[in-house]
Amino acid sequence: MKVFLTGASSGIGEALARHYAAQGATLGLFARREAELARIASALAPASIATYPGDVRDAAALARAGADFIARFGVPDVVVANAGISRGVLTGEAIDLPVFKDVFDTNVQGMVQTFQPFVAAMVEARRGTLVGVASVAGFRGLPGSGAYSASKAAATTYLESLRVELAGSGVAVVTICPGFIATPMTARNPYWMPFLLAPDKAARLVARAIDRRRRFYVLPWQMAWVGRLLKLLPRPLYDFAFRRAGRKPRQSA
């Protein structure tokens, strides 16, 4: 199996890299932190690994990485757009406008730019799976997390569009919506996180969903039910229930 993975230097991305390496997969790992990529590659030796330091907001860097991976290893079986950021924001604060842009550029545009270098080759080969990591946070708008919630809702809708667009091509599209995972990103959350999953457990569940080519998968199962209930809440009741919800700190403050 050949797997290309972004956001591979920590959290779910690192756990997925470890999972697939243990299965004997050939890996292409893309992330911003070069030292962390080197650490992971060393830890996973002697697995076949190519590392690509870069930012998913940089389309040219992803295009180069994709071309190199295909040239060295062939068309990937799985491409996982996992890179993402979460920042607390307030619309009334001008200083947060660049934060909104960074979140969307990473979580939405970065996903598109991750897939683009591989789509034509995968369609030509009539095989492969494109995997986008969205979030339960995209089911409803969370106060103070307007950028993150909106970006994950956009990612979910984009993935649905892509799935239908590629129907019949042999290329599957899998949408992954995690709840709370114990990662450096969630470690900053100053509020209760129900059904918190360890990254290794999350990676096993995600990999199983990918293997089964699940169109849409929420983990853990408890959050799937929470998500369904959230979607059913009438707007007045949702507003009342969440107006005092804990908020992610604003890093621009």
Please report, for each region that a protein language model flagged, where it lies by residue:
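Conserved glycine-rich cofactor-binding loop
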Residues: 9-10
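Residue(s) in the substrate-gating loop at a strand-loop-helix junction
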Residues: 135
